Every structure is written in C-alpha cells, then in structure tokens.
Amino acid sequence: MNTTTLIELTAPQAVNGRRAAYQSLWLLVRLYHAARYEAATEVVRLAELRQQFTDARSLRMFISRAFRDFSRWGIQVGWGEDADSDPRFLNPDRRSQGPFWLPPAEADKIACVVDGAAATREDLLRFLNIRSKPVPAEAAGMPMPADFWMRYALAQQNLRQGQLLATMAEHAGADRNPGALAGFKDAARMAVSRSQHALAALGEAQVWRRLDDLEAARKTLSRLRRLLKEAGPDEGGYLDAMEQILTAWCAYSQRDVALTEALLAAMRDIEPRASVVRYHPRIRFEWHNLMALVRRAHALNDRNSPVRQQAASESMAHFASALDAAFEIGSFDAAQQVAANVGMATWLFASEGLVPGTDAMGARPEALRWLLLSEWLSQRSGTSGQSAWNAIYLMRIARGHCDAGERPSLPAFRAQQPLQPADMAGYLDASADFRIGMPPVSDWLSLADRLLSAQQQGDSRYSLLQRCGCRLEHAWYATHAGELGPASRSLATLAAEIAGLPPSDKAFFQGMLRRFPAEVS
C-alpha cells in the first residue's frame, strides 16, 4: 500500500493531523466510499452535491476549493464519465461538470479513523449522512426539467441523419450543428436520473461505433454497464439488451464472428434477456438483423463447410424476422437496413451457388428490387437521404457479371458491359410506385462521384468500410470510362485506407486491386 492519508472523521475533522475543510473532506470521503463499496457506480454526480450542500453559494467554487485541498493532501481525484481515465491528463476546464471518482490506487492511500480507530462502513455512512442522497427520479417532485430530453431528442435526430460530429456554418465560422456525439455528451451532463444517464451513454456508444472508434465504444459501454448495475432489477431490460447488442456489433465490426454469435446466443438462451429478445420488437429487430449477418458470414466464408446452404437459408430466415420487427415498430430506417441486406445476400448467395436452380444472373432482378425498395424506404425514413450502402451494392451488382481476370489489358477491361441504370426499368414492372428508389443518374460513375463529393464536402460521413467500397466502385467505373487519372487516385486512396480494415475485409479489397489494368494500378 502507498503512503497513507489519515482522515479523522470526528470533529474537528483532520487530514494527517491538520484541520480540514468539512465540504472538501466530505467529498473525499464520499468518493472513498463509492470506490470501496459501490463498485457498480464508482462516481459521485453533481446532483448529489447539490442535495447535500443546498446552501453552497457556488458549486463551482466548492469544487475548485475541494480539488485544491485534494492536491494538498496528495490525492488525485478524477472527473468525467470515463472512470478508467488517468486524472493527470484530464482537462480541468470540464472539471466542475463532474461526475467525480477516485481511482483504486488513490483509494488505497486513504485510511479513515474515528477517534483513532479504523472506521467501519457504518461510520462512513453516519459521517456522510448518506440518507440525504438525492431522491430517485421516479419520486422527484415537479416541475420535471425538459433540458435533458431536448438535448437527447436533438442528438437522436442527428444520429438518425448521420450527423455524428459537429459541422461548421459556411460563414462566420459558427457551429451549424453540434452533432450527435456532442449532443449525447451534453444530454449526459443534464441527466437527473440513472435511466437518463444510461440513455445518453447508449447513444454515445452508438455514435462511437459508427465512427469506427471501437475502443471508445467499448469504454462507453463499460460505463453503461455500471449504470445498469446500479439500476438493478428496476431497469426494464431494453438498455441492458441494447448494451449487449452493441457489444456484439463491436465484435462483428472486427469480424470476430465467433464472439458475435456467442453473445447473441447467450441473449437468446438466458433469462431475462431471452424474454426481451422475444417480446421487445426493437431488440428483436436488432438481434435478428445481426444474427442474419453472422449466418451470412458462415455461408460465404466457410467454403469447406457442408452446411453452407443451410447457413444461407438461416440467414434469410433471420432477415425475414428482422423485417417483421422493423415494420412492427413502424421504422422505415430499420426496414431499409434489412431490405438492403436481403438484396445483397440474395445476389451473393446465388453467386456462390447456394440457391438451388439460380445463379447470379438469375438472382439479379430480385436482388435489385430489394435494393430499390431499401432506397425508397431510406428516402422516406427521415434520415439523411440516399443510402451509401444501397449505392455501393447497386454498382457492385451491376458489374457483377464482368470478369476480365487479374491484370487485364485496358482494352479488355473497358470492353466489359455492366448493367446501366436505365436498364433497371425492366425490373420494376410490378413496382412502379417504387421508381423513386432508382438513382437519378445516367451512369454509375456519376453516382460514385456524387458519393465521394458528399464525403469530401462533409455532407455525409461514411464508415471506413463504406469509404473503401465507394473508392473501389469509383475506380472501376472511372477505369471503364477511360478516366484513368481519377481512377488511379481512387485506387491509391483505397490501397492506403484498407490498412485499417479487419484481415478478411482487407483481403477482399487486395484481391480486387489486382483486377485493374496496369495503367491505373
């Protein structure tokens, strides 16, 4: 154990034999109690300080004075939502916003005594008057503040529209939109209950995952788990299930299919999560959509498996259940995700010979109809408009029958004949109402240019895998059109970006790079 900081709890309170300010000492003992006996919580929030010190003229001044005392006593206290951070590197400008926590190594330095004898937990509780903790939100009085819900709703809308980070106005350099990440963090600072803190943490974790920052996503999910443990059996199950779903998504994003499947299987088989998966339509959508992707991975990657066709069939069954749940909750955004996945899976399974009596060309009409349905839903879902995945999938399927081999000559490459956007009209005889889903472009290169321009101008933000997909399609259609300069630049960018992909995804793109003529490679 490190050098001990001795705290005498009886009046006059003292630290290492010297008189100590009561408020500063109270906060340190409260943090010590949280670290020692409240492992599921660990943090002390501003709401508790306001409840305990109602006559404090300025909470900011109180906190500043307390941290000066902590420094004088040789104790480092942390602040912010990430209790795993090193307090030495935290930004002091955000300190007054809390919450506060005591690292385990710092807690080991402290010894609390009562009249010189070691203090028990009951002694600590009596000193802290812990019964004066804030009333739970469920029993809070009126008026109920709207601040949290206003910030949270805006952050949710930004998340749905793909506005993950702050965007700048075209003039005057002012923020046009704080973005979903900042919005959920702001909402967390305004939260007045465990459930609100948990909702904000869930939203933040979703943003980090979509930003491809899986480490930050996992840290935020760890914070969410602590909040859920504190809530105990009162939590209805949705947040706990979503924490598991996001944890599984983080594993899938790194193509750890075995871990993803294990997490999902545990949710399905073990109560109380099994009941949430069964009866909560949003969780049922998330679970089946991700499990469908897992089974799709088995069907496409386990080439020596005798049950590939069964895995493909199971994947489609899970997609069907996910689509049922998406429409049950009335979410066009959820439904368009499933429709896009079904369209691509339909074509991929047929391409691999996993659909009896159907090859890639035979499956193409139905695959395209699913993708156009997805785009129609996307344009009506209140999100940011055209789906990048739908565009990438359409362009890939349109050239799917083209195969000039590795390192083809430029004339041979350009002689290939991909399906053109205008050719899709023949697939829509029974779906005239869904023509809006067709991209309003005359050729695929224009669509690829539009996607890249939206990314470069900050109008859309794509994941790393989406960026690589866009670059590949742009390079293919630019080469086909004879625009070798833009094609070469896209291939160079693609070659650099694939370094951040999981090995299986990287291998796919490396194989595709070898299928371009030397003039652009």
PLM feature spans:
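C-terminal non-catalytic interaction modules
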Residues: 1-9, 16, 20-22, 56, ...
